[in-house]
Amino acid sequence: MKFGKQIQKRQLEVPEYAASFVNYKALKKLIKKLSATPILPPQTDLRRAPGEPLDTQSALQANKATFFFQIDRELDKVNACYVQKEAELKIRLKTLLDKKKALRSRSGGTSRRSTKFTTLQEGFQQFVNDLNKLQQFVEINGTAFSKILKKWDKTAKSKTKELYLSRVVEKRPAFNPTVISELSDQATTSLQELGAWADGDNVSFETRPDHDHVVSTQHLLGTDEGDADTLLLDTVLSGNIDSLKDMLDRMKATAAPDGSADVSLAERVTRTFLASINEGSLEALKVLLDTGLVDIQSWDDINERNCLHQAAIYGNSFVLEYGLSKGVDAERTDAYGRVPLHYASMHGRLDMIDALLNASPKTINLIDHDNFTPLVHSIVRNHLECVGRLLERSARIDPVSDTDHVPLNLACQHGSVAIVELLLKHGAKILADAEGLYPQHLVARSGQTPEILVLLKQYGADLDQIDKLYGWTPLVHAASEGNVPCLQALLETGADPNILDEKDLPAMYYAAWEGHLECMKLLTPAKKEKAASELPPIHIGGALPPMASSTAPMPMSLDAIDPIPALELPPPIIPLRRYGHNFLDTKTVVQISFEEDSEQPLLFFQDGKYPAARLTISSKSSDLIPKNIILPFQEDTRVASFQIDNLESFTLDFEVFPTYGAKVIAKTVALPNIFRALLSSSGKCCLPLFDPRLRAIGQISFHVQIIKPFSGTPLEITDFETYWKATSQFDTNTSTFVTGSSLSGDFVQIYVQHTKDGVPVLWPRWTINCGGIDVPVSTLTLAQFQTVTAAARNRINLSELSTYTLDQIADVHRILANIGITLHEALFLLPKGMHVNIQVLYPTADEKAEAKSSTAADDVNEFADAILSVVFDHARAQRAERPDSVRSVVFSSYNPTLCTALNWKQPNFPVFLCNDMGREDRKQQQQGSCSKGDGDEDMGGTTAASRREAADERTLQSDGRRTSSIKDVVRTATSNNLMGLICCSRLLDMVPALVDAIKSHGLALVVDKSGEPEAANSKDSGDKQLGISGALGGLAGSDPFPKLPKGVDGLLKSNGVLRFNEYIDV
């Protein structure tokens, strides 16, 4: 989100601070104005001829004092607001702490039904919320100062940001986090103590004793007073009218002659009346009122609610009518800035809305501390009748300022068709909210009721409207969020799927990036209507823009590159070569990932009671840095990785803290046996969260992946060269692109999986036909597997395989794909100098569960070690035989866990993660490839020639293919230093912009055309193919490997040949 929109959204969320935010937009305009129209001539240019214009940098330097004068005033405004709010919060906290101490002074336990307990607990929770708002105000303004100073430095070519922040901004009280942290800790401690006292545990979580004199601001002057309050409330709630009258009579009889007891009694009865509005019977409330001791005008001194607030919250019509008849103020606001009408609208009290508006009509448009009017409260809680009544009473339907909520937008966001239609009938305008989103964007993003889109169009909404946030249309929002019904409704109403956003990306790009297959299917026919274009070139770098004219001043864009170079060294012209990657020598990697499966990763049993905002993951190991994760989890914070020395003694502590503070809310620990007991070195774990009193108050769930170092003897780095890749980064703000690598030439693809006893064997499918029954390969031992495949091996003289030339690499692939031998045998049978791409088939957890098979060899570490041992032994043997030549090896797999393990265990060979997203009719192709006649029938007497002829007519498809979002595979590849990705050519043809997106993360890209028959790429095929398909087409009668499109590093063909570009150092 753009920072300017972010500030506007935050102003909407905390309206009481809105006027004190940094005027970020005005400061940006000021920089632009000062750079274009200088006020003062620079002192260094006194001999400049009159009328001669100034260049941008000189103009800004001349007006430096003007800019920083304005910055200082903005800083004063922010700091003054903070100092005032901090003082108010300190006073509130002292009052709450005094009340808590007085509450604790009772000899009996504190009941949850106690009047003061409930209001005091609510008071502390409200204090925490207000404290969080203050800290958010400080954070967003601190970011604003940092960003605007960065823009100034960039435009003026100066270095003032860090100096000004450290010497001016950070010296102000507003940017000292210590005070807010201490206040947060005190409030969190008090909430924990209140909960303990209510359960009968007289404990204290104070870090130090406090011997200060307790000054109570409430009328609980002693134990007897507190007990009397509780006893009277219990009697009222019991509904025993006779006992209640008798108790009140006895209380009146004890009145002192001077009348002091009458005042105390009246306050006690008033407190009891307010507390019993919720559950007290009508008769009991009347008894209290008949005593004449109830001060009907009073309000609670913590939440500041009077009887009208309480009646509206709990739906007590009798109290509301009685209070209004006695002249109780209907305009009084409570601690949340709400009047009784807010609560009546919030809870759908239609009759109360009429009564309150008759008593005070001007409250209809009052806003509370959440910037909600009564109408907005009714909308977000879907109270249709209340919305209608408020509109009849002329409630404001459109915002009056940028900091107001837009009722129509909120109704669209919450998916109420009836309320949206009602608002539109009353003339609601189609407006953008503080984020720059129109109603149609919110409907498409939330995806609840696509019918609203049709309704909005009937009232004049443009369904191709571009928002002011990202430049997205509603169609892009629906595609990005995977909202299929909304996407379908938009397409049916004629929305244009080819509109590009501000990054020149279509809706299809975001659907593919997020992995929404159904959305991609809907967008594909619409995309075909527009002629495809050639793959756009990838701009890895480029020439400097033309020098700006110095003869005339011009307004300068803040984001433009200045023509005058800074006094810094230029970036290197030669791309940086990176040899190999980080790998495990003796350490073990433990990866913790928090994925949202069926439930939230971190869950409290009483939602809203514990204001958790920060998770800290730490270990007792001194060399491990704790991981701090801001909640809720974001895409870039869902994975935490630790490298440890010993898994046997490894523990992880999970601690949950409030937003700003160091007081632990909840804690748990993962013991070593949890990690040791994981099947296949991976699994899911769920741990209880305990509060300081060791009560389970929630749970935390996460996936664990353990990667151990290679158990065998690795290849020596000094004897065996690692692969390398060259990357270019032309400035610090651009992404890193792979411009070349040591991978070149042709690689034969072989499919490897494991047997029951953990031996890597060659077979492209999970099952093998044995006597008409498909048996999983992983359930067979090596001896059993060799018995089943013996007939196929007997048909071919395997010794002749080593005599094949490099031009026969496709024949080698076909032979090895259905011959059923071990990986060890295959590597020694391959012709000298023929490189190999080892495609590893390893089932995911879902595939294992579906196959109902689990063997000892399923452990990813054992299987990866078995493969690497074979490859390493072959490399050593080949080096001993021919020191000048070593076979190049590439690993690839659709399983991200296996790719991660293979990459962490060695630095010598690159690893590619495959993704099958975008392949057309993938399941049908797999079924066809596994049917009779595709390889299993070769166990009979079919000749090698007939098998080769049949293979020419069909495309061999392996099992284990997996579809993932581009976002997920890119994140996995970059976080684990993989070489790159292998993606389906059809996907890249539909969304060419994905090439740029993948390459910008420093990943190599291979186009996978293995799912397409050879005939589909011939010149004789019916339709001319464009984009990647066109660039890779023309196979009949021409070079089967034409020059790859720019940005593509390799091509995987259906004949099992992987070809990389010849390396050119750019």
From Swiss-Prot:
SMART domains associated with the record: ANK
Domain of life: Eukaryota
Pfam families: Ank_2, C2_GDE1, GDPD, SPX
Region of interest (Disordered), ranges: 923-963
Stretches assigned to the SPX domain: 1-166
PROSITE patterns membership: ANK_REP_REGION, ANK_REPEAT, GP_PDE, SPX
InterPro entries, per the entry: Ankyrin_rpt (IPR002110), Ankyrin_rpt-contain_sf (IPR036770), GP_PDE_dom (IPR030395), Peptidase_A2_cat (IPR001995), PLC-like_Pdiesterase_TIM-brl (IPR017946), SPX_dom (IPR004331)
Coiled-coil stretches: none
Sequence ranges of the ANK repeats: 268-298, 336-366, 370-399, 403-432, 435-465, 470-499, 503-532
GO biological process: lipid metabolic process; proteolysis
Domain GP-PDE residue range list: 717-1048
Gene3D superfamilies: Ankyrin repeat-containing domain, Phosphatidylinositol (PI) phosphodiesterase
Keywords: ANK repeat, Repeat
Single GO molecular function: aspartic-type endopeptidase activity
Biased composition (Basic and acidic residues): 946-962
Functional summary from the UniProt entry: Controls phosphorus acquisition.
The name this protein goes by in its record: Ankyrin repeat protein nuc-2
Source species: Neurospora crassa (strain ATCC 24698 / 74-OR23-1A / CBS 708.71 / DSM 1257 / FGSC 987)
